[in-house]
């Protein structure tokens, strides 16, 4: 029996660098990058609180898009709250997908290993829309600048169904607070409603048209 954390697997990714699969008594099995949990563990609990809040709005979710699928924590919860939904996941790092399948039970998702920006542009061209879009696009603790551009946010809004909801996950500690709040101001100019929700050290920005 392990008393603290046990490293189940370590791999080197050309995108995320060193990725560890960790098992702990407190948080179960999770995927960590640079000491920051990416999938499973506390991340699962953060998204559970967030999606529970969204589920209370009684929105109809037939199609869900997860940008930044990671190891699949969020996709499990989507199935829990909207069992009849069809989920599409986009993840740029195939290593995360592989570990998710091996250790976190990632399944029942249409997986696209590609850049989220390109996927959204492709969805726009084919006129696809989603009822729930989850944007969780960190590489470690870095949020790629291109996903803060107005052009990307406009594209997200266009592929969101009329009564749909999109939630952006931002880290919310130290200097990350200012970054998150600046991003929130951009969203407020593009969406009719932006709700601020704070589970743990994160800011979830829940937006609707």
Explain the meaning of each model-derived region.
Residues 5-6, 12-15, 173-209:
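Class I S-adenosyl-L-methionine
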Residues 1-29:
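N-terminal auxiliary segments of SAM/dcSAM-dependent transferases
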Residues 37-38, 171-175:
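Short histidine/acidic/glycine/proline-rich micro-motifs that form metal-
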Residues 163-170:
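Conserved beta-strand signature within the Rossmann-like core of class I S-adenosyl-L-methionine
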Residues 35-50:
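Conserved SAM-binding loop and adjacent beta-strand
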Residues 48, 52-159, 175, 179, ...:
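The AdoMet/dcAdoMet-binding core of the Class I SAM-like
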């Amino acid at each position: 029996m392990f008393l603290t954390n046990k490293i189940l697997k370590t791999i080197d990714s050309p995108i995320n660098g060193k990725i560890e699969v960790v098992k702990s008594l407190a948080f179960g099995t999770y995927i960590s990058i640079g000491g920051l949990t990416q999938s499973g563990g506390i991340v699962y609990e953060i998204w559970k609180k967030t999606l529970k809040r969204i589920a209370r709005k009684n929105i109809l979710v037939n199609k869900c898009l997860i940008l930044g699928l990671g190891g699949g924590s969020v996709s499990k919860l989507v199935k829990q709250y909207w069992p009849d939904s069809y989920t599409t996941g986009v993840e740029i790092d195939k290593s995360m997908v592989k570990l998710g399948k091996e250790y976190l039970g990632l399944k029942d998702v249409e997986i696209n290993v590609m850049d989220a920006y390109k996927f959204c542009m492709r969805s726009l061209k084919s006129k696809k829309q989603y009822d729930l879009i989850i944007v969780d696009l960190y590489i470690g603790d870095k949020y790629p600048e291109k996903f803060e551009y107005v052009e990307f946010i406009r594209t997200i809004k266009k592929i969101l169904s009329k009564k749909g909801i999109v939630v952006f996950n931002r880290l919310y500690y130290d200097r990350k607070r200012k970054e998150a709040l600046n991003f929130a101001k951009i969203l407020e100019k593009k969406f009719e409603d932006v709700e601020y929700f704070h589970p743990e050290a994160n800011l979830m920005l829940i937006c609707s048209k």
